[in-house]
Every structure is written in structure tokens, then in C-alpha cells.
Amino acid sequence: MKILILAFLASLAKAQEGCGIISRKPQPKMAQVSSSRRGVYYNDDIFRSNVLHLTQDYFLPFDSNLTQYFSLNVDSDRFTYFDNPILDFGDGVYFAATEKSNVIRGWIFGSTFDNTTQSAVIVNNSTHIIIRVCNFNLCKEPMYTVSRGAQQSSWVYQSAFNCTYDRVEKSFQLDTAPKTGNFKDLREYVFKNRDGFLSVYQTYTAVNLPRGLPIGFSVLRPILKLPFGINITSYRVVMAMFSQTTSNFLPESAAYYVGNLKYTTFMLSFNENGTITNAIDCAQNPLAELKCTIKNFNVSKGIYQTSNFRVSPTQEVIRFPNITNRCPFDKVFNATRFPNVYAWERTKISDCVADYTVLYNSTSFSTFKCYGVSPSKLIDLCFTSVYADTFLIRSSEVRQVAPGETGVIADYNYKLPDDFTGCVIAWNTAKQDQGQYYYRSHRKTKLKPFERDLSSDENGVRTLSTYDFYPSVPVAYQATRVVVLSFELLNAPATVCGPKLSTQLVKNQCVNFNFNGLKGTGVLTESSKRFQSFQQFGRDTSDFTDSVRDPQTLEILDISPCSFGGVSVITPGTNASSEVAVLYQDVNCTDVPAAIHADQLTPAWRVYSTGTNVFQTQAGCLIGAEHVNASYECDIPIGAGICASYHTASTLRSVGQKSIVAYTMSLGAENSIAYANNSIAIPTNFSISVTTEVMPVSMAKTSVDCTMYICGDSLECSNLLLQYGSFCTQLNRALSGIAIEQDKNTQEVFAQVKQMYKTPAIKDFGGFNFSQILPDPSKPTKRSFIEDLLFNKVTLADAGFMKQYGECLGDISARDLICAQKFNGLTVLPPLLTDEMIAAYTAALVSGTATAGWTFGAGSALQIPFAMQMAYRFNGIGVTQNVLYENQKQIANQFNKAISQIQESLTTTSTALGKLQDVVNQNAQALNTLVKQLSSNFGAISSVLNDILSRLDKVEAEVQIDRLITGRLQSLQTYVTQQLIRAAEIRASANLAATKMSECVLGQSKRVDFCGKGYHLMSFPQAAPHGVVFLHVTYVPSQERNFTTAPAICHEGKAYFPREGVFVSNGTSWFITQRNFYSPQIITTDNTFVAGSCDVVIGIINNTVYDPLQPELDSFKEELDKYFKNHTSPDVDLGDISGINASVVNIQKEIDRLNEVAKNLNESLIDLQELGKYEQYIKWPWYVWLGFIAGLIAIVMVTILLCCMTSCCSCLKGACSCGSCCKFDEDDSEPVLKGVKLHYT
């Protein structure tokens, strides 16, 4: 079947203003094709590097159904297709085309596609890209025609007028010749129309496809941002047709796939170059939602609470009362004469539509200030009533018409309340209002808000003064009209609303709603509540709005959240499997589809709302895990006695079953009888295991420069901060207390490591110093100075046998041969002989030789000891030399190997540190700039302090700065609270570490799995940064055997219990054995005791589970209603933040190399055979002792003789008398006369 193209007019066709007609055009097949993971694009202009970014925008959801359209000459049904229908644009479009002959030429965007509205044309005419926005007379079948491989006609539109955008892009030559074979080109586009701009994103991929759209991941980059400014609701594709003549054009093979964008959340992964390398559609399935919740592509095994990325609003519901009358603002503002200010007048406005845009867009008003509400929000709000107060004052007095102001006007004429909600509008009327007007200049008391005093005097004294308004007076004294609009918030049905059009009421779907100005997001459902006649909203116990009255139908509607938040995802870990199970907390399985709005979920999510693997638990509904009655190791505790495990099909079940299984944990049958026989497993064999346990006992100490953090360099802020008293001091005091506690934790933990008990050194006793006589108890193997003096000491290298020899020998030399030791199969003796040993062995040798003749050789047996001890000593010398040689050889080889490994490790470490240094240096300046900027951008307003002070007066500026200070103080308080919580956790960990130091290191714990995994043998502590590392040596069961056991045995009416261990039966007899090792013993009175009788007492334990308390949440509505002020916040310049090098330093290769080097270094540890040091003390012979004693006696005698031969009268200060031998003849002495001094000449 041919497609005939006929020109309307030949001249128009030549001018490219004609159109073509297609005869007998079949309807598109509209097959559905999965988008897989295509269509991701850069949705903003911000550069990001090495970061995961969560963004909400309009994206093509992964695995969306794309509709397929063709340009096809002849298909299997003998039809030709030229599919170019008008398609819905929606919130954006994803467009992908597979072709080989450049069939797809462009698009037309618009609304009505006629000349009454503007449309946008973006087409490729084979030489240029044409972009136009005009009122077009579009062709019914817009197309290009190609004749004999060359462009012939452009039948897109007939004419165009009222063009507002005209642009020609690029000059090129498009290959228009038709091609055969597979599709070679895949072009993808995304179109978004936002704020008057049509943004176009594109990517190209070379393919070789016979049909279909390839599965994969694609990222589109921005190419155009066109300021069209038109309404786009639909679009249409422009394609080309081909012919070898100038008529009878036929289509060539091409296909395009379209899908609409949806507002959803994506997580984008950017590499160091700012390129998107991976993406996740957070609403695609439970695992994708979990990855977005924890913001990580890799998820470890466990159960995780998720955030809601599943349901987003689909429509907008706006409901205002059916009011058509316009509010009479013109009568208020255009009154002929305004009253005096003291006699101000009020007008009530109700039952009308208020178009406030006319007011705040007017350029005639000199003042338009709103309090408690933003002018731009008025169009969306409804009020019970609006009051308009009017009066006339001077231009300079307008400032007093505001909440909290003082002055003549505010005190004595017109006063606004501090919580005023409304707008003040003023404009100069110097030419209109002239003459005398009155105001009250004084009054005994000030007026209350909205109080009016019409009197002209007070106690006979006139209180009114006059304004003299003339155009010639200064501006400050000229007449100014003032209108104060007071808004009465909804406490009754709304009568004044903005001019916003209402929409249809949509129920049972997630929508954005606006009821009389109450905005929100939720699901609207029919309610059974009853309202009072004046009631518009309903509130729950937490004072949150949970129901509303529709202002048009007066129907009461419940408002529920769009999503059910109590959803947890169970995963075995993404490294093991992508399979998950979902737990809906506190929900019956029958209610799950309604609770999560399953009809709005993706198909991948919807399978987790119903299905065959549905398991109702006390914790909620578990879907996606197979419930089994068996029990396995609890990998993932879910709660409420439920556990999940992950197994492969080969180790658990037959092929085809789920990999995640869930089961109820049980300690036995609920109705089991006490003392009934039960089976237990008792270890019969063990293996040694070493477990490493790291326990934190301290954390990094921190302090905060409070003033700098809150105020930066702002003097005004610092002065205001002083009013907060000692907050900063208390804050740092708390941080200091945390630091002190960390030191205390460390001290207490490591104080548990006590040294071995040592005997105190007794150096002084009763005034006598024994340090040179008694041995030093701190060195128990050393002898004292006197002992070293009285004995000769010989030190030898010990290959491993000399110490045992010395202990055996003692002081008896005759035991020398008996104390010979075994070493590596040889009998050895130390190569050392004392004089006693030499004398003994010599005597035996001589005696043996002398008696050999007359004892017929039997006496030669006395030579054997001498020969044996010589052989043994030669063996001792030999093995010692061999050990020394082998050790030297190992030292040389391993030292050389260690040196090379150390050199390599230093090189690798240097490379890694170089990388770290580069990143640290690059980030330092950028981080400093960022901190400085952030220090002025925090809290209630997004503005720097200087800007606050410059645009607000002092009082309001201090209020705003006070909010900023309060926000930052709250942040600091939260930080300190987190530190205190962390310190409490550290404290608990330190206490446990101290307990393990006492029980595991200094003792042997009997608690199973407390000191390591298994039964404890010994533990070794090692200090670690901010903690301690325990190396627990344990023995764990390698083999177990099941035995029937009983807690007690009844015999003759008495119950016998084991003193230690358990009773077990081997099938025929009962024994008692240890619980941790099977060592059966006969039951006797020694290992049992008798207690009580055989009666069984069963106790019932209360199993009540209490629900957690729900704290009552205070309502912020009243507070927030006061602060919807008209304050514009300037953008804060954080441009320097892009200077941060947020790249992740990849030093994994260096770390792996270091690990390898460390392994090699460990292998190079020298396992030397230990050479001990053996010291032997040799006693002197008897004659030496005899000479030593005789020498001491001679020394004493000589000392006494010398004393007696001198002229001393005594020796040793009178301790011994020498009077008989020390007295001289008195006659030879000179006379001594008392009191006479003799002089010698």
C-alpha cells in the first residue's frame, strides 16, 4: 500500500508552505517497552565531585513502560506506519529514537496546535537547526520529504505570524539517503518546561540493533535552554518520508519511544570529574528505597527502617467557597475624604473574593507592609472577615502605624496590637487632602489596641491639635492616607478568599491540597466525624489538623499521610543478594495494600504488598520471606521473637524457594513439663581460637569557641550574647567534664593491669644497712655483693640444657654425671669442671689405671665415668656451636629480607601520605572559607548579620539576631548532648573493659563467650587509640554429642541435684559430666546433693509487652502564625564552597601493598633457638678458706698491737682500756701549776 503525498498548490509547495496528505494511515500499535535505567539527566547547574546526591525533580522512573511508535515501510501485516500523533507533554518527556536514515527530524510543542495559540517548532531541515515560536498554521501531517537522497520539501506548517522567538543553529550537511540493515543510531532526549524555559537534554549512542530499545544506563547532558514562555501541554514528532521520484513517498524504518517524567527522588553518584556514573530511583523497589535512606549503594546485612520515597502527590486540590462577589476595596481606597486619625473609621468586608494582587502590585503606594502574613500568600488564603481602618496623618508618622511602636499617633490616636495580623498601606495625597485635620497630642493614659477616643478635651483641657496640610510644606509634613487591613483568622466559615479557582475534589489519592488557605499534602478520605456549624478544621490529641470541612460541599474529610512510615527492609547484604523482605510494623497483612497505597506504587514495590510469602507477626506483617518451622542461626533479629536468615538453595532447600527465611525463635514447647527429659549437646573435642576484641575507653576531647561560632566578628551579636549569661561557660564546662571523664576511664582501665607481686626490698632494718648482704628482692636471681665476693662465678651460653643441669646438681659435685641432660637426642653436659670434679675424675682415672693389672682389668671400669663425662661435654660444646651457627645464618638471611621489605614499605607509605597531603592542602583554604561563611549563615533567617543590621532598625535587628543566637545555642546544646550520650556509652564500655581486665587478663573466666568466643584460657591486653585491644585465647568445641539430660534424679522420694555439671544418659545408664566437656563419672554422694522432694513447681512469668509511650507534641501553629512576615532573605554567597576538593583519596593499592609488606615482615621474624645464660658459682677449697680466716686473725692482732705501742690512752674512744701499757713516768713531765702561765725561752 502506497502513501500518496499531494500538494495543495504547486506554488505553495515550491515556497515550502504547502502540506501533504497521507492516505489510509493505520493506527499506531503502541507497544510497551521497558525503559530499564535510561533517561537520567543533570537536573541542575551545580558542579558536584565524588559525592552521592539526593535530588527531587521530574525524572523518568526506572523500568517505566515506554510507548513505541514506528516509521515503517512494510511490517508482517503488510502495513506501512507513519506514527506521529499528538502526545501529552505532562511534566516533561523522555524521547528515545533508534534509526539509520535520519528519519526523526524534530518536534512541535504547544497546546491547541492551531493559529490561536503560539507553538514552538524545533526541526532539522538537513542543513540547519530551526527554532521558532509563532502562531502557526500547522500541517495536519507535518513532515519533510526526501527525493533521490536529497531534501525536497518542508511540509511542517503553511504560515507563521506573531513570532516571538526565531533562531537558526549550526550549519551542516545531513546525510538524507535511506540506509538498510540494523539500526545504527540511538538518540535520547529529555524535555522540561519550567518557568518559561524549555530545557533540552541529549545523549547519543552508537548501536547495532535489529529492533527494540537496548537495556542499560544512560545519562543526558543539557544542550539547550530556550526562553519560549509559552504553555506546553502537548507535542508532536516531525519525521521524513522518502521516494526515488517526486511523488509516492514512503516511510523508512525508524522507531521512537516516549514516556512522561514523574516527580520523584533520585540518588545520583558523581565521580571526581563531576560525571554521573550511577543512579538509583528511590521509589523503584524496597532495596532502592533503603539505599537512598542510608545514602549508600552498598548495604550490609540487617534490618533497616526506611524513609518514604514511594508515594508522591499526583494532583492538586484547591477548594474555596463558592463566592463570586468582588470585595469593595475600591470604595475604601477611593473615598472622597479620609477621617481624622483620632476618629478613625472601620469598614467590615465579607462575603467576597479579594484580589490583593491589585493592591501590592500598585506603584502608587509608598508603604505596603504586612505583619503575620506575606503579601504574596494572600491570594491563597481565606479569612472569616477583613476589616479596613482608614485615617489621615503626616508622612513622617506612618512608621508609628506598626506593632510595638510608640509616639503620639501610636499612644493617643491609633494603636495596633503586638500580635497584629494584617497589612498597613499608605500613599501620599498632598494634592488631594489640604486644609486642617485633627489629631490627639496628649492624653492621661495611652490607648489600648484598636481603642478609639472621640472626645476633644480632657478635664476641660483641649487635647486635639491640628495638621495644616498644604502641597508646599516639606514631604515629611504632607498628608498621607492610611488603610489598615486586619485579617480575622478562621474561627468560623470563610467569607473572604483570594481569587484562586477551585478544582475537583480528589479522594483516596496522595494530593497537595488547599482548603481555605490550609495547605498540606495527604490523602483525603470520607470521615465519620461531626463538626460544629462554625467549625472548619479538626485536630488530634497532638493539636495537628487531621480533618477538614470542604467549603463547597460541606463534607467532612479525614487527612492522612501519603505513606505509611513504619516500613523496614530486611536484606542479607547487597554483596550477597539483591533479594529483600519487607516488614510493615504494627499492621495486619490484610491492611497493608491500603496502608501503603499500593495502587500508586511501582510494580516492583507492589509485589511486597501482597503475595504468597506473607507472615503475620506480633511486630507486624512480614512479606517476602518464607516462614519455616525450622530453626537456624539468627543472622537478622527482626523483633517480637522473629528472626530471619539468608541461605542459598543448595544448602537449605530445593531450587526455586526464597533465599530469605523467617522463623519464630523458641526455647521449647510452651506446655513442656519441668524435669522432662531433654537433649543437650556437650562438647567432646576442642580447638584453640584467638579472638580480638577492641573496646573504646575514651574519645577525642573537644572544646568550642562559643562566641566565634555564634557571632563571628560581629560586635553587636557579641554584646547581645552577654545577656545569655554563662551559657558558653557551662557548655565548655560540660565538654571539660567529658574530657576529664575520658582520662579517668583510661586510668581506671589500665590500672587493672597489676604487676606480679614482689617482696619489698629490706635495705634498712633497726638502723643497720643490709643492702650489701641480703639479695635484692627485685632481682631474685641475683646474688648479693658478699655472695659474689665469696664465690667464683662463671657464665656460659646455654643452648637449653644448662639451667636444668644446674638445678639438678645443686652444691653436690659428685652428681655431675647423674645430672647429664638430653638435647636433640644427645646426652650432654656443660663444658665446665670445678676443681672438685677434676680431682674426683682424676682420682678415678688414676685408680682405674693403677689397679687394672692386679684386678684382671676390672679396675679399668673406674675409667668409664671420666670417659663418659668427657664425651658428654664434647656433645654439649658441639650442640651449642651448632645453635650459634644456625642462629647467625638465620639472622643474616632474615635481616637482609627485612631490610628490603622495610624499604618498600617506606616507599609505599610515602606515596600514600603524599596523596593525603595533597587533598588536605587543597581543602584547608576552602574549608576555612566555608566555615567563615557558615558562621554568618545559620538559624532562623538566611542572612548575614551585617545585612540584618543594615535593613532593619535596631529593635527588630536585635530580635532577628536573638533568633540567630538561639538557633545556634540550640545547635551547640544538641552537640553537647550528643557528646554526653557518647561519653556515657564510652563510660559503660570502659567499665566493661575494666571488668574484662580483671576477669579475663588477671584471671580465668568461667563465663562462656565473655572473654572471647568459647571457653576462656587466657587473655592479653594491648593499648589502642582511645581504647584497649584484648587478645582472648579460648578453646571452642569442634565436636559435640547429643545426650539426654535431666536437671535432677528422683530416688526414694528425694531429688538429687549435681554439685557441678549435669546428669546425662547414654541410653542405658546415668552419669554426671561437666557441662563444657564430656567426662562421664559415676553418680556418687560426693558429686551430688539432696534437696527437696520430687514434686514439680511450675512458675508462670508475666509476658505483658507494653507499647511505647507517645509523647504529646506541642502545636507550633499559633507561634508560626505570628511570624509570616514580609521579609525577603538575600542569597548567601557560598561560591567558594566549590573550591573544596571533595574527592575520596584512593590509597587502597598502597594499603594492600603495605599489608603484603607487613605479611612478609612477619614471615621474616627470626625464630632463633633460645640461648640462655647459665651462671655457676664454684666454692673455694678448704685451704683457701683456712688461709682467709688466718689472714683475718692476723689483721686483728696487728691492729691491737699498734694501738698499744702508741701514746694514746685508749683506743676506739674508750671502748677498750689500754692503761697498763699506755702510762708514762710522771717524774719526767714538767710541773703544772694552776693559774700560772709558763713562758719558755
Curated annotation (Swiss-Prot):
Post-translational modification: Specific enzymatic cleavages in vivo yield mature proteins. The precursor is processed into S1 and S2 by host cell furin or another cellular protease to yield the mature S1 and S2 proteins. Additionally, a second cleavage leads to the release of a fusion peptide after viral attachment to host cell receptor.
Coiled-coil ranges (or none): 917-961, 1143-1171
Annotated signal sequence range: 1-13
Region feature (Heptad repeat 2): 1131-1170
Residue ranges of domain BetaCoV S1-NTD in the record: 14-294
Record topological domains on the Extracellular side: 14-1181
Localization annotation: Virion membrane; Host endoplasmic reticulum-Golgi intermediate compartment membrane; Host cell membrane
Top-level taxon in the UniProt lineage: Viruses
A single GO cellular-component term on record: virion membrane
Chain residue ranges for the region called Fusion peptide 1: 784-805
Membrane topology field: Single-pass type I membrane protein
Segments passing through the bilayer: 1182-1202
Lipoprotein among keywords: yes
Residue ranges of the region described as Heptad repeat 1: 888-938
Disulfide bond entries: 19-139, 134-163, 282-292, 327-352, 370-423, 382-497, 808-819
Gene3D superfamilies: 1.20.5.300, 3.30.70.1840, Single helix bin (1.20.5.790), Spike glycoprotein, N-terminal domain (2.60.120.960)
Entry keyword set: Coiled coil, Disulfide bond, Fusion of virus membrane with host endosomal membrane, Fusion of virus membrane with host membrane, Glycoprotein, Host cell membrane, Host membrane, Host-virus interaction, Lipoprotein, Membrane, Palmitate, Signal, Transmembrane, Transmembrane helix, Viral attachment to host cell, Viral envelope protein, Viral penetration into host cytoplasm, Virion, Virulence, Virus entry into host cell
Locus of motif KxHxx: 1237-1241
Family: Belongs to the betacoronaviruses spike protein family.
Record remark on domains: Fusion peptide 1 (FP1) and fusion peptide 2 (FP2) function cooperatively and have a membrane-ordering effect on lipid headgroups and shallow hydrophobic regions of target bilayers. They are considered as two domains of an extended, bipartite FP. The membrane-ordering activity is calcium-dependent and also dependent on correct folding, which is maintained by an internal disulfide bond in FP2.
Additional comment: Bat coronavirus rp3 is highly similar to SARS-CoV (SARS-like).
Subunit structure: Homotrimer; each monomer consists of a S1 and a S2 subunit. The resulting peplomers protrude from the virus surface as spikes.
Protein name: Spike glycoprotein
Source organism of the structure: Bat coronavirus Rp3/2004
